[in-house]
């Protein structure tokens, strides 16, 4: 059975540092260290002088050796208190100090040689090899290292506490963020549930009204059929009688001809309207409601997809890239065409001949969205609606007259002639038309690579690093080769530009009606910038928001 820890500690205190056994007849020397009396007799003087303490190296006089009776009594008591009687005295000390015994002398290592960096026992310390060296007690030599370790431990404990604090705070932040996400999940579900409920109610309301109309039409159909069948039966009877009368002999026929024809006078037969005018009117109103529903859902879907999928960004124009033909507002969000080259200094990044300008902020990833408003003098909503109404009336008149639908929208597209006329055009006339198209008053909105050419005449097409729409009073074109003419339902006053860099698309929409106008597809490898081009007096391009 093992000895208790306090008893073992006492055993170490009453162990002689020389013989490593219990102190037998313990005595103290001048320096205060205690050894067995017999062990002190083995300590010889140094170089003819006085002997020195094996532990602290202080000289002492053997005549001053004094017994320590209290310690001797303590040794006896410890021996009596030993639990493990089978263990010999000093065995505990040896068990605990085996790893600290001198390999040569099997003595306890009390000293540390600072010259050789080795632990020494008393015998090694007195040997010829280490006697000239600086040797100190192991406890004293270990103290600086212990202090360094303790300081390092203190630093590590502070770091541990900081990490634990950061970890606790991080865990709290994570839990808070998860709570936010859970709350947002519930809000999303509630929002969609509310939307589903609203749409379901509107759907049921419209379907109920439509069912009532269907019932009215069905009831009218029964009445119409019943009355028509009655009229047909009456006419069938009259026809049958008249057919029989017509087959009678002449004498019999002429007996009551006057009375017979009087009985069957010719009446105006019934022609009823199968559908009441009020029902037709309400059906037409339903058609208008359906168009409004489709338009509203299209606008809602477009805006929702844009807001959820794309990040709306605020962009500004780069004045260093602006052509001398253009004038920028102070906030760099509006550009106008001056018609005169007003720049006295040509910046390296400036468009030289083309009236173009780039945005100040570029994009190399993500999905972003911004808008460009085309503000044209004389473009009022009333005028546009009037033009569309007049155009619709003209188209109806043309259709009634046997003509095909026109090409117009807004101001209308001109029909330049028949296919035969187009085929008869020479190469020179085609080149003249291309030149006329190039100088056509118009504007372009889109995106461009940051490396797009700025000098000389440019085509500003996708192969040149520009993906843009061209707008004019005559129509809209995708600036491709060849140009693709577009026919949106409405002329856009505000063009939405949605850039999906990773997806490789640039999508243009009518920002007001959410109508899709055109989508470019490409693989982007460089930074893309907003791009505006304006050669249209009286027109301003404004970046939104």
Swiss-Prot record:
It is found in: Cytoplasm; Nucleus. Its EC number is 2.3.2.27. Residues 376-440 are annotated as: Disordered. This is Tripartite motif-containing protein 26. Zn(2+) binds at residues 102, 105, 124, 130. Gene3D superfamilies: 2.60.120.920, Classic Zinc Finger, Zinc/RING finger domain, C3HC4 (zinc finger). It comes from Sus scrofa (Pig). GO terms for cellular component: cytoplasm; nucleus. It is an enzyme of class 2 (transferase). Autoubiquitinates upon viral infection. In turn, autoubiquitinated TRIM26 recruits NEMO and bridges TBK1-NEMO interaction. It catalyses: S-ubiquitinyl-[E2 ubiquitin-conjugating enzyme]-L-cysteine + [acceptor protein]-L-lysine = [E2 ubiquitin-conjugating enzyme]-L-cysteine + N(6)-ubiquitinyl-[acceptor protein]-L-lysine. Residues 295-545 form the B30.2/SPRY domain. Keywords: Coiled coil, Cytoplasm, Immunity, Innate immunity, Metal-binding, Nucleus, Transferase, Ubl conjugation, Zinc, Zinc-finger. Residues 380-401, 412-440 have a biased composition (Acidic residues). The keyword Transmembrane helix does not apply. A zinc finger (B box-type) spans 97-138.
């Amino acid at each position: 059975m093992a000895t208790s820890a306090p008893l073992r500690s006492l055993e170490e205190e009453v162990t002689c540092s020389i013989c490593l056994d219990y102190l037998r007849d313990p005595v103290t020397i001048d320096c205060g260290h205690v050894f067995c009396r017999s062990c002190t007799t083995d300590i010889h003087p140094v170089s003819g002088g006085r002997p020195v303490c094996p532990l602290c190296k202080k000289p002492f006089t053997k005549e001053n050796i004094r017994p320590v009776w209290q310690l001797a009594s303590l040794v006896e008591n410890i021996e009596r208190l030993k639990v493990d009687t089978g263990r010999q005295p000093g065995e505990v000390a040896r068990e605990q100090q085996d790893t600290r015994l001198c390999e040569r002398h099997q003595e306890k290592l009390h000293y540390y040689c600072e010259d050789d960096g080795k632990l020494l026992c008393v015998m090694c310390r007195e040997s010829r090899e280490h006697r000239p060296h600086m040797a100190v007690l192991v406890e004293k030599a270990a103290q600086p290292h212990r202090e360094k370790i303790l300081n390092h431990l203190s630093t590590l404990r502070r770091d541990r506490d900081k990490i634990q604090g950061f970890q606790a705070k991080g865990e709290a932040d994570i839990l808070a963020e998860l709570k936010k996400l859970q709350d947002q999940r519930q809000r999303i579900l509630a929002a969609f549930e509310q939307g589903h409920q609203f749409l379901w109610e509107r759907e049921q309301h419209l379907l109920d009204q439509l069912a009532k109309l269907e019932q009215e039409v069905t009831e009218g159909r029964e009445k119409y059929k019943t009355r028509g069948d009655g009229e047909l039966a009456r006419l069938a009877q009259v026809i049958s009688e008249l057919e029989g009368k017509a087959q009678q002999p002449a004498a019999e026929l002429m007996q009551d001809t006057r009375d017979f024809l009087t009985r069957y006078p010719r009446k105006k037969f019934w022609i009823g309207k199968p559908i009441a005018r009020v029902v037709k009117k309400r059906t037409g109103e339903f058609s208008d409601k359906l168009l409004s529903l489709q338009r509203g859902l299209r606008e809602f879907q477009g805006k929702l997809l844009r807001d959820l999928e794309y990040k709306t960004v605020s962009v500004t124009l780069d004045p260093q890239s602006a052509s001398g033909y253009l004038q920028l507002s102070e906030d760099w969000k509006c550009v106008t065409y001056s018609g005169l080259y007003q720049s006295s200094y040509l910046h390296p990044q400036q468009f030289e001949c083309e009236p173009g300008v780039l945005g100040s902020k570029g994009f190399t990833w993500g999905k972003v969205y911004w808008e460009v408003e085309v503000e044209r003098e004389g473009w009022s909503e009333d005028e546009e609606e009037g033009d569309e109404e007049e155009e619709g009336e003209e188209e109806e008149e043309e259709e009634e007259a046997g003509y095909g639908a026109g090409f117009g929208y807004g101001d209308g597209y001109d029909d330049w002639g028949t296919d035969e006329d187009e085929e008869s055009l020479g190469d020179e006339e085609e080149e003249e038309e291309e030149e006329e198209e190039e100088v056509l008053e118009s504007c372009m909105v889109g995106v461009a690579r940051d490396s797009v050419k700025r000098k000389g005449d440019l085509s500003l097409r996708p192969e040149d690093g520009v993906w843009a729409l061209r707008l004019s009073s005559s129509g809209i074109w995708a600036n491709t080769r060849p140009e693709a003419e577009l026919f949106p339902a409405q002329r856009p006053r505000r063009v939405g530009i949605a850039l999906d860099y990773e997806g490789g698309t640039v999508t243009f929409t009518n920002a007001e009606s959410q109508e899709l106008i055109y989508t470019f597809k490409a693989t982007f490898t460089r930074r893309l910038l907003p791009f505006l081009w304006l050669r249209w007096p009286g027109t301003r391009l404004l970046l939104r928001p």
